[in-house]
Amino acid sequence: MTRSLKKGPFCDAHLVKKVETAQAIKDKKPIKTWSRRSTIMPDFIGLTIAVHNGKQHVPVYVSENMVGHKLGEFALTRTFKGHAADKKAKK
């Protein structure tokens, strides 16, 4: 279920504050955040945001087609190692 339109998109205040200061001083360093739940706003375009995946901060470069999605969608939390091979097929 999507968020109600009358509520508007959610973005943590501390993240918005960091983005505004980074844009004001034209800083290209990644903005470190733990807020995976924040929606990507049009102000974020062109910035690199380091999103925490539970273990480390994954750098995410924000482009135009990411607007409206959540930051957590681009920092995967699980690593897929592959399914176990079938022993009968190897023989």
UniProtKB/Swiss-Prot annotation:
Disulfide links within the chain = none
Q: Which top-rank group of organisms is this from? A: Bacteria
Q: Which GO terms describe its molecular function?
A: rRNA binding; structural constituent of ribosome
Keyword flag Phosphoprotein: no
Q: Which Gene3D superfamilies match?
A: 30s Ribosomal Protein S19, Chain A
Task: Could you list this entry's UniProt keywords, alphabetically sorted.
Answer: Ribonucleoprotein, Ribosomal protein, RNA-binding, rRNA-binding
Which cellular component appears as one GO term in the record? small ribosomal subunit
Q: A Pfam family this protein belongs to?
A: Ribosomal_S19
The UniProt entry, under InterPro entries, shows: Ribosomal_uS19, Ribosomal_uS19_bac-type, Ribosomal_uS19_CS, Ribosomal_uS19_SF
One of the GO BP terms on file:
translation
Asked whether the keyword rRNA-binding is assigned, the reply is: yes
Family per record = Belongs to the universal ribosomal protein uS19 family.
Q: Which NCBIfam families match?
A: rpsS_bact (TIGR01050)
What HAMAP family does the record tag this protein with? Ribosomal_uS19
State the protein's purpose: Protein S19 forms a complex with S13 that binds strongly to the 16S ribosomal RNA.
Recorded protein name is: Small ribosomal subunit protein uS19
Source organism of this protein record:
Herminiimonas arsenicoxydans
What gene does the UniProt entry assign to this protein? rpsS
